[in-house]
Design a protein with these regions (language model features):
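Structural signature of FAD isoalloxazine-binding scaffolds in flavoprotein oxidoreductases
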Residues: 40-42
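Metal-associated gating/positioning segment near the N- to mid-region
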Residues: 29
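Auxiliary tRNA-acceptor-end handling modules of aminoacyl-tRNA synthetases
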Residues: 1-14, 26, 35-38, 47-124
Length: 124
C-alpha cells in the first residue's frame, strides 16, 4: 500500500502519469473507437482527453474506476521504447490527435517515446 500523503510532487508525477495511461486504456477498452489525445499528470491528479462517440456521464465513472482497478492487476511494469516519427505515425495511424502531437515533437527535434504496460501502448 502506498502512503500518498508523504509523497512530494516529483514522486507523485510518475504515479499520476501512469494512472492517466491506465484511464486511457480503460476507456478505449470500454468504449471501442475512442481516440486518445493527451493524458498528463497535473498538480492535483491526472486526466485524459478522449474523443469518443459515446457520451460518458457521471454515472459511468464508477464502472470506469472498477475496470481500472481490474486492469491494474496486469500492469506491473512499463517498457519504454524510443521510435522515429514515421514509426510513431504508423503505430497511431487513424488517430489524428496522436499524429498531430508526433508532428509537433518531430518539428521540435524532441524524442518520441512509447510506453507499454499490459497490452496498452501510448506516447509519453
Amino acid at each position: 500500500m502506498l502512503l500518498l500523503d508523504n509523497m512530494n510532487h516529483e514522486e507523485l508525477h510518475p504515479l499520476r502519469h501512469s494512472l492517466a495511461h491506465l484511464l486511457g486504456a480503460t476507456v478505449v477498452k470500454l468504449y471501442p473507437g475512442s481516440k486518445l489525445t493527451i493524458g498528463p499528470s497535473v498538480d492535483n491528479g491526472f486526466y485524459y482527453d478522449i474523443d469518443t462517440s459515446t457520451k460518458i456521464t457521471e454515472n459511468d465513472l464508477e464502472h470506469i474506476e472498477q475496470e481500472m482497478r481490474s486492469m491494474l492487476k496486469s500492469w506491473s511494469t512499463f517498457s519504454h521504447k524510443e521510435v522515429s516519427a514515421d514509426e510513431a505515425r504508423e503505430f497511431f495511424k487513424g488517430n489524428e490527435y496522436k499524429t498531430e502531437l508526433i508532428n509537433e515533437l518531430a518539428e521540435k527535434g524532441e524524442k518520441i517515446s512509447l510506453y507499454t504496460s499490459g497490452d496498452f501502448t501510448d506516447l509519453c
